[in-house]
Amino acid sequence: MGSLEMVPMGAGPPSPGGDPDGDDGGNNSQYPSASGSSGNTPTPPNDEERESNEEPPPPYEDPYWGNGDRHSDYQPLGTQDQSLYLGLQHDGNDGLPPPPYSPRDDSSQHIYEEAGRGSMNPVCLPVIVAPYLFWLAAIAASCFTASVSTVVTATGLALSLLLLAAVASSYAAAQRKLLTPVTVLTAVVFFAICLTWRIEDPPFNSLLFALLAAAGGLQGIYVLVMLVLLILAYRRRWRRLTVCGGIMFLACVLVLIVDAVLQLSPLLGAVTVVSMTLLLLAFVLWLSSPGGLGTLGAALLTLAAALALLASLILGTLNLTTMFLLMLLWTLVVLLICSSCSSCPLTKILLARLFLYALALLLLASALIAGGSILQTNFKSLSSTEFIPNLFCMLLLIVAGILFILAILTEWGSGNRTYGPVFMCLGGLLTMVAGAVWLTVMTNTLLSAWILTAGFLIFLIGFALFGVIRCCRYCCYYCLTLESEERPPTPYRNTV
């Protein structure tokens, strides 16, 4: 029975002259002496001494665990061969192995998350701020034929923006010293325009129109750059000065809109509403994504809408066909150039969705301009019974624009691709309702039909962005039944 006794690990077989139980301390190699000789061996310690002298096990990071000895099966991740993970070099984890017992969920990754999110890239500034030249030129063109009160209000708005720019330049001068001389240039050009306005006759002076557009462009570029730099510098700690500047800016915009409505110029009000709303949209997009696809999206959306508004004012009173074709061609060219320069399939998918959003924006902008034109044409001849349906339809178009803003912010801000298309579909339905009401009361049949068509196209774009499969999954009874059934749990396999 002595041969069946358990032998401690690492101990050799019992010596021939020893006890069968291996307890003879004379020749037992389990307890070598300090001098290395096998003759003078101490007596084996008892249980109490063993427990007191027993060393704790080596830590997990100890090199002993990964040197290929008897514990080599338990090597830590840091000491394993890195060639095992060569297939993970492009998985967004810098080639490191996944942590143990933590499955990777690709759906949790932000699809619009960009690598290297950092500070604002100065190279993108001319691309982003260029649309505002067209916006303010369009507003200036509307003011060119408007009343004196509208011109005075626009002047007050520009002066307020200059004051806000002067305040912002004091904070941004340390980072962007080149923009400080632009303040002086903008002020000189603006007051030169005001002086020319007082001296010359506005309706017959093309030079005045060009100077006014140039002044508006300079103001727009400078003020927006200053605002962005100011908000980027203090977005995490909102100062009282920033809040006051924002309130002043919104108050000036509100005054301009109210003045445009009171002066029986709904077209100017519609242009201003669309311009300022898109300005805010691009501004939020830029803040949420300082570089990369977010900046590209802001640039494309704002440029498309701005050029659409400018084309509608230059090419005629309301030349929707020419405006739509020009903007569609321009957006297609830009997106094709961007997609050809990128080999990433994810980038191409995002650019395709961006093109659909830009197309919906063009349709919505044209519907707003058409609604403003209908309201302006029939404003003087409207009775009290006809005024309420027209005002209701215009409010529906404004709500559709707000829903479009929510769709953009939801998709490009949070990465949620479900609620953005839903908001766009709702905006398209509201636009269709407005066009149907105007078509029912026989108010400018051509423009009403276009608003109805634009709403239908916006709804189709939202449905395409949402996806037919996802719509079936969320709305179909059988898909909901399958989703509600309990599935058997599957064990997790940690395979690399």
Curated annotation (Swiss-Prot):
Entry's family note: Belongs to the herpesviridae LMP-2 family.
Transmembrane segments: 124-144, 148-168, 178-197, 211-231, 241-261, 267-287, 296-316, 318-338, 354-374, 388-408, 422-442, 449-469
Highest taxon of the lineage: Viruses
Keywords, sorted A to Z: Host cell membrane, Host cytoplasm, Host membrane, Host-virus interaction, Membrane, Modulation of host E3 ubiquitin ligases by virus, Modulation of host ubiquitin pathway by virus, Phosphoprotein, Transmembrane, Transmembrane helix, Ubl conjugation
Motif range (PPxY motif): 97-101
Protein name: Latent membrane protein 2
PTM comment text: Can be ubiquitinated by human ITCH and WWP2 on the N-terminus in a lysine-independent manner.
Extracellular side: 145-147, 198-210, 262-266, 317, 375-387, 443-448
Sequence positions bearing Phosphotyrosine: 112
Membrane topology, Cytoplasmic segments: 1-123, 169-177, 232-240, 288-295, 339-353, 409-421, 470-496
Start and end residues of each stretch annotated as Disordered: 1-108
Miscellaneous note of the record: In healthy individuals, EBV typically establishes a persistent latent infection in which the virus can be detected in resting, nonproliferating peripheral B-lymphocytes. These latently infected cells express only 2 virally encoded genes, LMP2A and EBNA1.
Any one biological process term the GO annotation gives: symbiont-mediated perturbation of host ubiquitin-like protein modification
Polar residues bias locations: 27-41
Organism name: Epstein-Barr virus (strain GD1)
Any one Gene Ontology cellular component term annotated for this protein: membrane
Pfam families documented for this protein: Herpes_LMP2
